[in-house]
Amino acid sequence: MQAAHPIERAVGMEYYVSDADGVGGRLRSSPADFRVRELEAFDTEPVDADTGAYPHLVFRAELRNWETNDFASKLSDRLGISRERVSWAGTKDKRAVTTQLFSVKGVAAGDLPEIGGTDIEVIGRAGRPILFGDLAGNAFEIVVRDTENTDNAASVVADLRAFANGDDSVTSEGWSSDATLPDGDTTVGVPNYFGQQRFGSRRPVTHEVGLAIARGEWKDAVLAYVGNPNEREPESTQEARGYVDETHDWAGALDRLPGALGYERSICHRLVENGASEPADFREALEALPSNLQSLFVNAAQSYVFNRILSERLERGLPFDRPVEGDVVCFRDSDAPEDFPIPDADRTQEVTAKRLSTVERHCERGRAFVTAPLVGTDTELGSGEPGDIAREVLDDVGLEQGDFDLPGAFDSDGTRRAILLRTDLGVERDSADLTFSFSLPKGSYATVLLREFRKGDPDA
């Protein structure tokens, strides 16, 4: 186990589980180096089905260098319809080639426009829109270019294979200095951290905003979002955010904040209008943001706490592949593909001493998964040492479960999430480039696996 990069530690990912040195290299040298294909889980009727019963046209789109929201906005503009009539199952990053399903209400197949950087294939019709989460997972093919030590990849694979199986024999020197890349796929495992994208890749602050909101510190939440300069931003943006931190002059901030920072400017406009004299004024300014962004702040705070819980579990040497007394496990989704087990966070059970050996067998056979809380008002924290870890992390960030009883879109009941991410990984070497092929359940991050190989700046 090694200490992670400082940017990763700032969002709760405190360790790499692999002791082997990294390969370095660059991610996303071009969009084609990061390919994502949805593993679809949405049924459709034929394209010529009755439009009254099946008003939603479903199509598969390959997007090249398109962020999902931007494509949906462009599509709705070209169709002359509300953006709310376009739906999809999962949001994908821009600098990639992505293949995913969309649905559009009240549109004929022939109405779909040609849009640069996209290929569209009509699939059929449906009686309801595609909803967020209507997928089994995602298949990835990712190229890391210009690695500094390609040979290290084999040792990382060996370490991650051991972690997936709960093997404690990895040493501080790494698994094997003379390891070779296996032929075909190898089952590997990593902690199921929330990746850097959850918090902001270049400026990871969304969790800071969410933590302040959960504490009821509304002004601090605004300052964390509008102020709080980051060295990776343009100098003019850093100066504008620094001005906010120093002066709390919202009118002056509007003169300095770039037009591209639309949400920050919206907050400042609202504060100029309401006087910014009471905590409720700052809450009102945040509530003026889109509801999905409000939820994102609190979700990022929950994700940060989750990452901290996983890091503490690593620090204490507790297993990830099997439970200890006091853990809460969830069971396999009965609707998941036979060869692609997916955890069902709605079916949980706390592990008692009496049930420990039985649940261990379920985990070994892929029928159950150890979980940790995404803390909200109704989350079960567990007991024993796992419960202690969750409560200690909450105490360290100054929160209690009841703090997530928040107004409107900020409110969250919480849930649970599997702590071990397993996948069958293929690695191919071409000179100094490495190509990684694997599939992950929905909600898990490819970069969380790749960070174990690169071991460096996640934004490089």
From Swiss-Prot:
GO terms for biological process: tRNA pseudouridine synthesis. Its EC number is 5.4.99.27. The keyword Ribonucleoprotein does not apply. GO terms for molecular function: RNA binding; tRNA pseudouridine(13) synthase activity. The active site is at 93 (nucleophile). It catalyses: uridine(13) in tRNA = pseudouridine(13) in tRNA. The keyword Mitochondrion does not apply. Belongs to the pseudouridine synthase TruD family. PANTHER family: PSEUDOURIDYLATE SYNTHASE PUS7L, TRNA PSEUDOURIDINE SYNTHASE D. This is Probable tRNA pseudouridine synthase D.
